Every structure is written in structure tokens, then in C-alpha cells.
Regions:
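PLP-dependent class I/II
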Residues: 3-7, 21, 25-42, 46, ...
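Generic structural signal for well-ordered alpha-helical scaffold segments
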Residues: 62, 116, 120, 146-147
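Conserved N-terminal alpha-helix of the aminotransferase class I/II PLP-enzyme fold
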Residues: 102-135
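A glycine-/small-polar-enriched, mobile loop at the entrance of the PLP active site in fold-type I
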Residues: 75-80, 93-112
Length: 437
């Protein structure tokens, strides 16, 4: 006779128990195969959160590649370059020096000082180290921010199309994401009147992401000033995600909204990290710069959740911020070359189009001209069916726009080599041509 062993918390129930070992904390039951147990209940809070569609698509493409299929993946939200050598060497050196113990929960002082210097040098912002909280990636920094600032029912304006995690992070903090859709004809930028119309007496904050994922737009200084005026007038917090700040093209300029006035600085949480500019997505180092009382609240929260970020990754991040930026410049130049080619190829395909992005490494491809057409009798009804049909028939992975709140678009990343861009867009052309009315 076969048996299954499962752990049941004290007070749990299971049928068909043959033998029990009881401790103060738990009971171990050995059950006969096929016996039923009560399913653990998932909290309503967790049930309200959906998975990351971008990560799901990327995982699906990698799984297909592992099976030997020739998949062209345009889903990745990470540079395809290696972490620069001087950063890798700094991590090796930290290991050799035994820098493997706890650091302060909010990050080591040396790194926080380097972040302050970076903000002064590149953004014209003055912060003290105690105003910096280093976390396990910029996503974790955003998580801490919303946890520190939101109470149940507080509303957060999220411009759409938006990065998939913004609404979910707000929900996880008990807040209510209020999405306001920008239009392609306005370069996917919200107008001040759109933002003003979305403000209610429950509005607590607005999210800004410039340069933007998934659209690639970059707000100008004047546009940011207009948004800042609304924030001041309605006493709103600005959550400014600036993770793509160095990845700008065609003369676009990244401006941190916190640098526009002392009043805006006091109501802005600056979010940034190492992942995109330094090809360090797996190292997981992000940070916030904020008013001191907010930084203290986030530090307390983090001290009971993850404690400090990885110590070796912190030493690597210190080298990134204080070392040479030659590879960054080369990476931006290569992204620009790929960007121009991808835009050219997309706009040459009947039924598809895109606006040239000014930042990040994404293109939002408009699929409106193909909606309603069919492949072997199966209609393209929106971004999800487009994505599924394209992946199944041509082995090209893109991210459906529905995950960004824009169902008539799909997102393509040009953080891949030029060969893949040429091959993948050729397959997309074939796919579009194969669709029938």
C-alpha cells in the first residue's frame, strides 16, 4: 500500500489518518493515497492580485525554446547585454573580502551615499543618505512606497497604457487604481485636463513613468510642470518611476519632476534602480529617494519583510553608480539602431503601425487594422488572440496590450539582437498577410 506524507498545521483536519506525530507547532499526518484533505483558503487580498502577464509570456517563449522550437521573443523587459565587467569584478571582490553579512535594512551607507551623489550629478536633486531606501529591485521599491502611503480605499491615478504591475501593487496595498487612458495621437501622454478630471476626494497619488514602459514616451519639462501644478493644487503625492532615465533617443531629455521645485520634491517619491541602465535585472537592486519620514516608514516596513537587499549585489551597485559608463553609452546607441529598424519594419506591414518611441526599449504596435480578420477561421478579437495566434503559427512572442490596459496594441521589446528583429518582423509580416476577412 502506498502513502503520501503531508504537513497539516495544528488544528488542521485530514481524513484516513494512520499515524500522527504532534509537536507544539504542527502535526504530521501520513495518509493513504486518494484520501481527501481540506484545501487551504487563499486570502481575498491575494485573490485580487493577478500574475504578471509579461513574465508569463517570457516564460512561455523560453519553455518553447527549451523544447527545440525556433521562437523569436519580443517579450523580454531586460537588456540583452552582460553586466559590465567592472561591476562583476566588484561583486567578486566583495565575496573575496567576506562582505556576506547583514547590512542595515535600508542598505549600506556607502551605496546610499553613491545614490545621493548620482541624484545630485544627474538629476539636480539634493538628498541625505537617510532619505534613501535600497530595496530588492525597483518593483520592491514601488511595493514599499504604496504600502507606506496608502490606506484602504485610497485612489491612485495610473496613466494608461501602464506597466502591468502598477495597478496590482496599488491593490496589494489596499488602494484603488484609477486608470486614465492616454491616446496614441497624443503620443500616449495624459493631458492636464484628463488628470484633473480623474481627481476625487479619495485621490492620494499619481504614478508617473518617464521614459515609459510600455509606450516609450518621454514627458517634457513643461508637461511635467503642468502635472506638478495639479499635484500641488490637489495635495497629491507623485510616485515617479525613473528606471529608464538613461535610455532616451532623438534628443529627448529625461527630467525628474522632483527637480522642478522644492515643493514638488517634498511630495515626490523618486523610484530608480540598477536593472535597465546597467544590465543588472537579476541582481535586484532598486531604491527610493523621499522625504525623511517616508523613508523611515519604508525602512521599518522592509525591516520586517525582506531585511536588507543582497549584500554582494549592493557592492556591485556601488561600482555601477561610481564607475565608468562606456558600456551604457554603447548600449543606448545599439538600442537606438534597433529601435529605428523595428519602427521602420512595423510601419511597412499593412494593417500594423507604431509611433517611434523616444525612450526605454519598447514599441507599442497598433493592431487595429487586423482585428476582425481570421486565421483558419479563428478571428483576431484583440491583443490576446493576436498574441496566441502569432505564437502558435509563427513562433513569435509579443506581449498582449490588454495587460497594459490597451487591447488594440501589443508590445514588442527591441532588447534583442538585430537578427531576431529582422527574422521576427518578417514572420509578423507573413502572419498579417495570412489573415483573411
Amino acid at each position: 500500500m502506498g502513502y503520501n506524507a503531508i504537513i497539516v498545521p495544528a488544528g488542521g483536519r485530514a481524513r484516513g489518518m494512520d499515524w500522527t506525530i504532534q509537536t507544539a507547532a504542527m502535526r504530521l499526518h501520513i495518509l493513504k493515497k486518494g484520501d481527501a484533505i481540506t484545501m487551504m483558503r487563499i486570502s481575498k487580498r491575494c485573490q485580487a492580485v493577478t500574475g504578471s502577464l509579461t513574465l508569463e509570456i517570457d516564460a512561455k517563449a523560453k519553455e518553447m525554446k527549451a523544447r527545440g522550437l525556433d521562437v523569436v521573443g519580443f517579450g523580454a523587459g531586460e537588456p540583452d547585454f552582460d553586466t559590465p565587467e567592472h561591476i562583476r569584478n566588484a561583486a567578486k571582490d566583495a565575496l573575496d573580502r567576506g562582505m556576506t553579512r547583514y547590512t542595515p535594512a535600508s542598505g549600506m551607507l556607502e551605496l546610499k551615499k553613491a545614490v545621493c551623489e548620482k541624484l545630485r550629478r544627474d538629476n539636480g536633486l539634493s538628498y541625505q543618505p537617510q532619505q534613501i531606501v535600497v530595496s530588492n529591485g525597483a518593483k520592491h521599491s514601488l511595493f514599499n512606497t504604496f504600502q507606506a502611503l496608502l490606506d484602504e480605499g485610497d485612489e491612485v491615478i495610473v496613466p494608461g497604457p501602464y506597466w502591468v504591475s502598477y495597478p496590482e501593487l496599488v491593490v496589494m496595498a489596499g488602494g484603488v487604481p484609477v486608470t486614465v487612458q492616454a491616446q496614441e495621437e497624443n503620443n500616449f501622454k495624459l493631458s492636464p485636463s484628463q488628470i484633473e478630471a480623474a481627481v476625487t476626494d479619495r485621490t492620494r497619488a499619481i504614478v508617473l513613468n518617464s521614459p515609459n514602459n510600455p509606450n516609450g514616451f518621454v514627458y517634457t519639462r513643461d508637461e511635467l510642470k503642468a502635472i506638478g501644478d495639479i499635484a500641488i493644487r490637489h495635495d497629491l503625492i507623485i510616485v515617479s518611476d525613473e528606471i529608464y532615465e538613461y535610455l532616451v533617443y532623438d534628443g529627448a531629455e529625461h527630467v525628474s519632476i522632483a527637480s522642478l521645485s522644492p515643493e514638488l520634491k517634498e511630495r515626490t517619491i523618486v523610484i530608480n534602480g540598477m536593472s535597465k541602465a546597467y544590465a543588472m535585472t537579476g541582481w535586484r537592486i532598486g531604491y527610493t529617494a523621499s522625504p525623511l519620514h517616508v523613508a523611515k516608514a519604508m525602512t521599518n516596513f522592509q525591516s520586517h519583510s525582506t531585511s536588507n537587499p543582497n549584500s554582494i549585489a549592493q557592492w556591485a551597485a556601488l561600482a555601477a553608480l561610481s564607475g565608468p559608463d562606456d558600456q551604457l553609452k554603447n548600449m543606448v546607441a545599439e538600442f537606438d539602431r534597433r529601435r529605428r529598424r523595428m519602427v521602420e519594419l512595423i510601419n511597412g506591414i499593412p494593417g500594423l503601425s507604431c509611433k517611434p518611441p523616444k525612450g526605454a526599449f519598447y514599441v507599442m504596435m497598433n493592431i487595429s487594422g487586423l482585428i476582425g480578420k481570421k486565421l483558419d477561421g479563428v478571428p483576431v478579437t484583440g491583443s490576446m488572440s493576436f498574441t496566441e495566434l502569432l505564437l502558435e503559427s509563427k513562433q513569435v512572442a509579443v506581449v498582449p496590450g490588454i495587460g497594459f490596459g490597451a487591447d488594440r496594441y501589443v508590445r514588442l521589446s527591441y532588447a534583442t539582437n538585430m537578427e531576431n528583429i529582422e527574422k521576427g518582423l518578417a514572420r509578423i509580416r507573413e502572419f498579417a498577410a495570412s489573415l483573411q476577412d
